[in-house]
């Protein structure tokens, strides 16, 4: 995170009441771990590999404007292909995120943790919630600003039988 980003998160931490968390899980990527450190100072961060952001392959680091003339980009955004060249298949991405969430849930149950926070990338949050959350929403309807997110409730019997989580608030 750049110094301005750290300050922005510190100001947000002072202005917003973040949920209590007995454990902090995170994407292993540096900016998520740093965000966790700012929002939950002094807490140990438990990285979960499967919570990493999407692998955009050849599209990585490029803006949509830079990719406009690239035929594979329009094929990918229109759904003609399921992955950017050299990138991750969208269905595999969702499966991976669900495995990551399940790792966190199982760890919580094994360690008698009832409240936790998960630091993830915006696109990963959107994809995971569009696949698992009620109320049901389109992927684009699960956006959140940096340092913000959603509060979810996991009912063990419902989660283990269907993979469903309930979103009940925003942070």
What residue ranges belong to the model's regions?
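Domain-level recognition of soluble alpha/beta enzyme cores
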Residues: 135-163
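Short beta-strand scaffold positions
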Residues: 26-27, 95, 119-120
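Active-site signature of alpha/beta-hydrolase-fold catalytic machinery across serine-
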Residues: 38, 127-131
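Acidic, His/Gly-rich catalytic cores of divalent-metal-dependent hydrolytic chemistry
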Residues: 163-171
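Active-site-proximal alpha-helix that buttresses catalytic centers in soluble enzyme cores
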Residues: 1-43, 90-91
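Generic structural signal for well-ordered alpha-helical scaffold segments
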Residues: 10-14, 94, 98-109
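Phosphate-handling substructures
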Residues: 39-98
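Generic beta-sheet signal
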Residues: 22, 112-122
């Amino acid at each position: 995170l750049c110094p301005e980003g750290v300050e922005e998160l510190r100001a947000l931490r002072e202005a917003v009441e973040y949920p209590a968390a007995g454990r902090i899980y995170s994407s292993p990527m540096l900016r998520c771990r740093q965000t966790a450190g700012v929002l939950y100072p002094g807490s140990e961060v438990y990285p979960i590999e499967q919570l990493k952001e999407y692998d955009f392959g050849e599209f990585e680091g490029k803006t949509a404007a830079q990719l406009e003339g690239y035929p594979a980009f329009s094929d990918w955004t229109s759904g003609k292909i399921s992955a950017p060249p050299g990138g991750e298949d969208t269905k595999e991405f969702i499966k991976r995120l669900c495995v990551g969430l399940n790792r966190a849930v199982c760890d919580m149950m094994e360690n008698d943790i009832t409240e936790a926070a998960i630091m993830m990338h915006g696109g990963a949050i959107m994809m995971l919630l569009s696949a698992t959350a009620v109320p049901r929403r389109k992927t684009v309807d699960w956006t959140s600003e940096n340092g913000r997110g959603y509060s979810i409730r996991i009912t063990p019997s419902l989660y283990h039988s269907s993979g469903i989580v309930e979103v009940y608030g925003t942070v």
